[in-house]
Amino acid sequence: MTAPTKKRMPHVFAGLLALVLAAIILFAAHRVLIHLEHATIVSTAPEVFALKNQGLAFQRAAAHSPDVLPIYGSSELLRPPAPERGNIFFRTAPTGFQLSPVAGGGANMLIWLQKVGALGSTLRGKRLAISLSPNWFCTPKPGVLGYTGNFSPMAATEMVFGTALDFGLKRDIAARMLQFPETLEQKSLLEFALRRLASGRLLDRMVFYALWPAGKIQAVLFELEDHWAALHHIKRQTKPPPQLQEQTIDWSQLIANESKAKPADAGMIQQPSRFDRKITQGSRDVGFLTGVKTSPAWIDLDLLLRCLATVHARPLILSMPLGGEFYDHAGVSRSARDEFYRKLPALVEQYHFPVVEFQEHDEDPAFLIRHTPHLTAKGWAYYDRALDDFFHGRLPRG
């Protein structure tokens, strides 16, 4: 060994030692942050905030907690600010669990399946709920703003470069994601990987595997950023933990009480007199049925169900009813609407998941806020009962 080589050896050793120490420190910090996220789950689980929706740290913490039921949905989980709303009603775990909503206005199934794929094995055996808006399944061209506004580069990257989903499922998901190019602007690595996945060609598959190390590095960087943001949220914005207290809920009595519309609900319930001139019954059935037949929401729901089955999650699929009274006045008959109520459970039950679509409330004006896919206090009482049944292993009631 030459003299210059001997002189370099201590520097090389010192450099390696510094790298090892840095790795140990990062690993320790990572474990501490995860412990903090789990320790504060009682406070963060019932809350709705952007970081929970965009990141994965708080979703993982909820998935690890045996006393928390995650629910994925859209703006129906955010309103109204009534005590019956799920995350408020279950805030103190009156029946033994808290509800943890992950939601954003316009969030849809293509958004949720990316989160499911990103969480992967964390969801194995975990009970969770999915809340669907029926309107998505009745239009051939749903809006794109909900998807673009809720798109999470972190969840998408982790799903694409993670190992939870098989290549065929990733290929089908990639084909749908590429239909929203605006979400992939300035995300060249993710877009390139999605195009390789979607093509299905052997060469592109080999290129994708060559990209895998770079994708995993990107995912790790996203994860570190997410944990530090979670730390900031816990230190600055987390509310004091609620006092958990179990109590006996008389669901029949609660629902009976809420079935009598409260004054606070009066302005939210659509009355027939407020509709425009009634259109001939059934005159718009063909257009409605065409929407139900061709809506891409069915593709996204199937992809979501495939993801849930692949990671071995245990989901409950909930769907609000259609605003039947509105559709009656809009010229869409009940027999046409029944096609949605037939098609939804038929698809979900292929995966052996429980589904509740509240079909019997199709023409109940007190179930939805006006005719929109948002629940009144009465609607939430029914949702709450189904969630409680499901968490405790009972058959969910509609």
What residues fall within each predicted segment?
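Hydrophobic membrane-insertion alpha-helices, especially the h-region
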Residues: 11-31
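Histidine-centered active-site loop/cap adjacent to the catalytic His
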Residues: 371-398
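Secreted/periplasmic serine-hydrolase-like ester/acetyl group-modifying domain
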Residues: 38-39, 151-310
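Membrane-embedded segments
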Residues: 76-172
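N-terminal Lys/Arg-rich, disordered targeting/topogenic segments
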Residues: 1-10
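Membrane/wall-proximal cationic-aromatic binding patches
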Residues: 33-97, 114-118
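Active-site His/acidic residue clusters
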Residues: 272-275, 283-287, 321-335
